[in-house]
From Swiss-Prot:
HAMAP family: DapE. The gene is dapE. Its cofactor is Zn(2+); Co(2+). It comes from Sinorhizobium medicae (strain WSM419) (Ensifer medicae). Pathway: Amino-acid biosynthesis; L-lysine biosynthesis via DAP pathway; LL-2,6-diaminopimelate from (S)-tetrahydrodipicolinate (succinylase route): step 3/3. Keywords: Amino-acid biosynthesis, Cobalt, Diaminopimelate biosynthesis, Hydrolase, Lysine biosynthesis, Metal-binding, Zinc. It catalyses: N-succinyl-(2S,6S)-2,6-diaminopimelate + H2O = (2S,6S)-2,6-diaminopimelate + succinate. This is Succinyl-diaminopimelate desuccinylase. Binds 2 Zn(2+) or Co(2+) ions per subunit. Catalyzes the hydrolysis of N-succinyl-L,L-diaminopimelic acid (SDAP), forming succinate and LL-2,6-diaminopimelate (DAP), an intermediate involved in the bacterial biosynthesis of lysine and meso-diaminopimelic acid, an essential component of bacterial cell walls.
Length: 397
């Protein structure tokens, strides 16, 4: 039986408790949908010291080009307070036209719809005019070390090449058809630490309060703005995400303070140029002494996250026009091409082929009572099916 019904496909996937790093049966369920319609599937377990082993799936139909990849993940975030859910989070319960369950939107729903779209395409037209592959990881919501990165490396090493990729992440803010993601901002994280001298709060002259120093440095990171944005990207933005002193006593000046930060940056910067700018800001602030009158310049240490994400923008007309045309044909609206939001595994795929993202409405992702409208599943399946036909026509032209 062809898996042409996205509702049935999604219910099967939701019932698999695949909270990162557990496979939970989700990849097995997906494989059982794909093999009857002609896909050959491989299961790859990726490993790295200090991280959980992760099971991934790569499935392909066809042997020649053009080659379209669909990428995504079956792992989901924890359910949170299960008692707060209206329906059990892995039950795939349907109520008032919506299916409830962890991963319904992010992003088992997108996978279920693309499976249905491919099955419908094959049922109507036979095998695709080239190849279609599914690159599905169980490590997107986690560290993202043993997932898409290693699956791409494995596939490329065995000779796989792709002409384009669609990632099925939820991209629409309020309704299906609003937004296609054609790029992503870069992401850079770090932590600065300042050593002080611990002492009694009543005798500050005998101590050196590192909180003053860390506030001075943190302010310099956030102000002034890094830029005003570009044609395709919003302004780069730095947020201080934690300030920690490890001190529970109200009458003790702490011995050290640290602050973590994250920058989402546009195409005016690279990770390297942004690091240089941040260090320059910290150096200037360290010598200013505004919050530390009469004290020596602040001495700080900075540690960078080992894996910054680089900014990218996809400019592949065949891919973008095929998808935007499919969205307009099915929904009647022209989607906005956007680079907003957080990072996704598209940041890894961009090094192998042009990539865009389009999926469900993301309003309830990661929330209690994550859910998707059944009508949206049918609409997205229709868009995906139309896109598949249009993309192969474009690619063959």
């Amino acid at each position: 039986m062809f898996p042409t019904d996205p509702v049935s496909n999604l219910a099967t996937l939701i019932r698999c408790p695949s909270v990162t790093p557990a496979e939970g049966g989700a990849l097995t369920a997906l494989e059982s949908m794909l093999t009857p319609i002609g896909f050959k599937a491989d299961r790859i377990v990726a490993r790295e010291a200090g991280t959980p082993d992760i099971e991934n799936l790569y499935a392909r139909i066809g042997v020649g080009g053009p080659h379209l990849m669909f990428a995504g993940h079956t792992d989901v975030v924890p359910v949170g307070d299960e008692i707060a859910w209206s329906h059990p989070p892995f039950s795939a319960a349907i109520a008032e036209g919506e299916m409830y369950g962890r991963g319904a939107v992010d992003m088992k729903g997108g996978i279920a719809c693309f499976v249905a779209a491919v099955a419908r395409h094959i049922e109507k037209h036979g095998a695709p005019k080239g190849s279609i592959s599914f690159l599905i990881t169980g490590d997107e919501e986690g560290p993202a070390i043993n997932g898409t990165v290693k699956l791409l490396e494995w596939a490329a090493a065995k000779g796989e090449r792709w002409d384009a990729c669609l990632v099925g992440e939820p991209t629409n803010p309020g309704g299906i058809g609003e937004m296609i993601k054609i790029g992503r901002r870069g992401s850079l994280s770090g932590r600065i630490t300042v050593q002080g001298v611990q002492g009694h709060a009543a005798y500050p002259h005998l101590a050196d309060n590192p909180v003053r120093s860390i506030l001075q440095l943190a302010h310099a990171l956030m102000d002034p703005p890094f830029d005003d944005g570009t044609e395709n990207f919003q302004p780069s933005n730095l947020e201080v995400t934690t300030i920690d002193v490890g001190n529970a006593a109200v009458n003790v000046i702490p011995a050290k303070a640290s602050a973590a930060f994250n920058v989402r940056f546009n195409d005016l910067w690279t990770a390297e140029s942004l690091m240089t700018e941040i260090v320059a800001r910290l150096d200037r602030a360290a010598s200013a002494g505004a919050l530390r009158p009469g004290r020596a310049p602040v001495k700080y240490e900075i540690v960078w996250n080992e894996r910054p994400s680089h900014v990218f923008l996809t400019r592949n007309d065949a891919l973008i026009e095929s998808l935007s045309g499919a969205v307009e044909a099915v929904t009647g609206q022209q989607p906005r091409l956007s680079t907003t939001g957080g990072t996704s595994d598209a940041r890894f795929i961009k090094d192998y082929c042009p990539v865009v993202e389009f999926g469900l409405v993301g309003k309830t992702m990661h929330m209690v009572d994550e859910r998707v409208a059944l009508a949206d599943l049918e609409t997205l399946t229709g868009i995906y099916e139309t896109f598949i036909a249009r993309w192969f026509d474009h690619a063959a032209a």
